[in-house]
Amino acid sequence: MNSSMLGLATTFSLTLLAFAAPAVSHAQGSATATGGLPFEVKPVGTFDSPWAMAFLPNGNVLVTQKEGAMILFDPATGTRRTMSGTPAVSSKGQGALMDIVPAPDFAASKLLYFSYAEAGPGADSRVVLATAALDQASGSLKATKVLFRGQYALTGGHYSGRIGLSPDGKYLFFTSGDRQLFDPAQDPKSTLGKVLRLNLDGTPAAGNPLAARGFHAAVWSYGHRNLLGMAFDRQGRLWEMEMGPRHGDEINLIKPGLNYGWPKASNGNHYDGRDIPDHAPGDGFEAPKVSWNPAISPGGLAYYDADLFPKWKDSLFITGLSGKSLDRIALDGENARKVDHWDMGERIRAVRTGPEGALWLLEDGPRGRLLMLTPKR
């Protein structure tokens, strides 16, 4: 396969179809399309193309929106406030004000980590990781500092931009998509198509596994496409979810220094129908733990280990955009399997575990709802 043969304009337009396509049939495998939902769904608020959410210690939730707004929302009262001081965002294509994660010491420091797409010269853009202090009293972000800037690319897709904090709170993990350029995912000098491990100040963390082999010093793993979810489990294992090409969406167990294959291996195909070699034993690439064919176009991932849904402890939850779905993946050590698939009727962008153990979803689109999922009574 010669990935560079794809025309850039064709690739861009076809990739965007995954974000705007009608529903696709549910994931194949051991998952079941549950008839009727085993939870109550309560709409709590409506947002303009929401992208991500983060709960604060006082129960409020921060919601990012595609065009660049950050909303402080009180689920109990429905009151909301748009934060001032947010950066300028490039919202073309898949650009947005993206992920948001409170610092481990947020109660004292008020620090947030967030990501966004930044416009560059001409039509170029890049993904940015930044930090700022949240002043809830004044409704503003203060002392904003950029921690990492990705490489510029002409396309408006595959920014990724998901943020994870290591369980010990010492490191930032950050996903940098391939920007629809394919080959940089295998390029040691590029940060595109990679999982990065950074110190809290944005510098490459010492001990990253590939620096001695000539890779960019921040690289933790490589061979990735469009990484749209990341979460640590109770044992500190890092799980990552990414959107495949034409099908082949996948969940990976991220280990330091490994090559996850893109664009040389995928369980999907190119959008024009050309084959990509499937993952196979002995091919030198780390295969996904779970993949989907047909695609669900995953939007977000969360790890669940709370008590409100006791039978779902130690599970991953995956949202579907084109799939209009919520999937549960049961974990067993380093293994994962599909167990539940629920039709949610709308494109689902994000999922999080709330303070009391409820699951919270964000619908995609200009009137995307914030939904609270609790056990059916």
Task: Give the label of every model feature segment.
Residues L181-S190:
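Acidic/polar, solvent-exposed loop segments in beta-strand-rich repeat domains
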Residues F215-E250, K255:
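Repeat-solenoid scaffold signature
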Residues H26-E40, G139-L141, T203-A212, N267-G282:
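Blade/loop signatures of beta-propeller domains
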Residues A9-A21:
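Bacterial N-terminal signal peptides
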Residues H26-F182, G229, R237-E240, G244, ...:
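Acidic, Gly/Ser/Thr-rich repeat motifs that build Ca2+-stabilized beta-propeller blades
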Residues L196, D249, L253-P281:
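Mobile, glycine-enriched helix-loop/loop "lid" segments at the mouths of ligand-binding/catalytic clefts
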Residues P75, A132-G139, L196-A205, K255-Y260, ...:
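Short loop/turn segments immediately following beta-strands, especially the blade-tip
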Residues N335-P355:
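Conserved blade-ending motifs and adjacent loop-strand segments that build the rim/top face
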